[in-house]
């Protein structure tokens, strides 16, 4: 989903995508942040119906990401929107909103209407 500025929103798919996501978590919340979502969980999230997606500049650099887990509670499928970050150098460009709308679009396409 390319934007007018050439930014593309898409699922994380390569080793470098996952590593960039981990680095952006540390850049956003600090090197000592203890709740970094590791590469293995980002991949499992996707395999289990969750979302691990990024906003990428035309040069391939990750500008932001969104992460959430899909599950079942009381017999109802729902999505837990866990984390969103935008690189400080790319803030105030609407990327956070675009990532949340991307997340919504993907979830609705999967038939998931409840997000917490």
Each PLM stretch: what is its role?
Residues 92-105:
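Conserved acetyl-CoA-binding loop-helix of GNAT-fold acetyltransferases
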Residues 27, 91, 108:
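Short polybasic/polar patches that bind polyanions
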Residues 1-6:
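Basic/polar N-terminal segments that are highly enriched at the extreme N-terminus
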Residues 107-116:
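Conserved GNAT acetyl-CoA-binding A-motif
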Residues 7-88:
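A conserved beta-strand-loop-helix scaffold within acyl/acetyltransferase catalytic domains
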